Amino acid sequence: MNPNQKLFALSGVAIALSVMNLLIGISNVGLNVSLHLKEKGTKQEENLTCTTITQNNTTVVENTYVNNTTIITKEPDLKAPSYLLLNKSLCSVEGWVVIAKDNAIRFGESEQIIVTREPYVSCDPSGCKMYALHQGTTIRNKHSNGTIHDRTAFRGLISTPLGTPPTVSNSDFICVGWSSTSCHDGVGRMTICIQGNNDNATATVYYNRRLTTTIKPWARNILRTQESECVCHNGTCAVVMTDGSASSQAYTKVMYFHKGLVIKEEPLKGSAKHIEECSCYGHNQKITCVCRDNWQGANRPIIEIDMNTLEHTSRYVCTGILTDTSRPGDKPSGDCSNPITGSPSAPGVKGFGFLNGDNTWLGRTISPRSRSGFEMLKIPNAGTDPNSRIAERQEIVDNNNWSGYSGSFIDYWDDDNECYNPCFYVELIRGRPEEAKYVWWTSNSLIALCGSPFPVGSGSFPDGAQIQYFS
């Protein structure tokens, strides 16, 4: 066979193989299409587990690639969402451990970190996030000048992964406003933001990110809400809102919502004289809120809400161990019904406590005059016994470092616990007014802690940024 004949013979064989592979490819495509149509036409059974079948056929024909892929995916078995029921009591706590620290100001020296204040933590069935009111700027941006002001048109609520400093890329915008609260009922999240003028603000209410209603002011003097998470039971969420003077008589309401709509509202009942910035937690089909009396009391007022009757009452934490800032010295005996006066300077700061009988813990700044340091005090029966005293103390932030607002939160969807493990956060404020020598801005980082059923060691967890680096 001469060379030309050999060439023709080899070419013929190659063409035959190519045609054969092409026919195989076409048959594979036809088979895959028929299987896919059969799959779509077959009624899916319930409670299917996630199954993925991947078939790859690759044929090489003289550097030509033909790929056939079949992917059959079945939906996972997802548990239907249900309303949260507050059927558990609080867990017993022997000490507190840090679960998150975002170091936002330290990162902000070189990264584009958003200026925030009034942060808090709130959880849902998928986990916990940090929420905070941003100032419409980053720390290194010139617009950060003047962010000491609480109420501007540039503020809004954002959420970020817990323990991660807020940046433009990782922050999820939620609503416009300068006061907020947010909570999940097990099915959806309700959020309230307050915006507008001091004398005519508007509360906007969202459920699953859709605007559901608005609320007008009733005293036309800085309508405001909790600055930490609200709490829900069986589809009803309770929120404490105040309108009126910060230094004299104000007008507080306990409002009840279902899917973002008001179903009931009550004017404040009980003996509390002034209510602001409540930190609330749920237990035993009830909600307990530990609040701020910005008018008279260095002892904290509390609101107790029965979520079965949607009724509430108010009074004061009974112990003489005072937990607002500023405050006079601790008293040998407290008062369950009346404010304890005598604060030496600024009238108050947002705070919290867990009133759990013998396992009651209260948080406060270490300094009685300024927002510096932070400590947790175990005071058995502080909520009911005027003569209760400190049994244990745990330092969270040493008194050489700034603190700020603090509040409670609970992961109600932690199914590994037969009780609700109490948690709290501390805002670590930096910048103005305390550090006006170095910077023009005011912002914060955050630490979050949860209870441990076992004894813990010691440690201080300050913000840690060297403020002079920002000069």
UniProtKB/Swiss-Prot annotation:
Post-translational note: N-glycosylated.
Database matches in InterPro entries: Glyco_hydro_34, Sialidase_sf
Pfam families reported in the protein's UniProt record: Neur
Cofactor requirements of the protein: Ca(2+)
A biological process from GO: viral budding from plasma membrane
Active site: D150 (proton donor/acceptor), Y405 (nucleophile)
Catalytic activity: Hydrolysis of alpha-(2->3)-, alpha-(2->6)-, alpha-(2->8)- glycosidic linkages of terminal sialic acid residues in oligosaccharides, glycoproteins, glycolipids, colominic acid and synthetic substrates
Chain spans, region Involved in apical transport and lipid raft association: 11-33
Residues annotated as glycosylated: N32, N47, N56, N57, N67, N68, N87, N145, N200, N234, N401
Virion surface face of the membrane: 28-471
Stretches the record annotates as Head of neuraminidase: 90-471
Gene Ontology MF terms in the entry: exo-alpha-sialidase activity; metal ion binding
Comment block on domains: Intact N-terminus is essential for virion morphogenesis. Possesses two apical sorting signals, one in the ectodomain, which is likely to be a glycan, and the other in the transmembrane domain. The transmembrane domain also plays a role in lipid raft association.
Subunit (UniProt): Homotetramer.
Additional notes on this entry: The influenza A genome consist of 8 RNA segments. Genetic variation of hemagglutinin and/or neuraminidase genes results in the emergence of new influenza strains. The mechanism of variation can be the result of point mutations or the result of genetic reassortment between segments of two different strains.
Name of protein: Neuraminidase
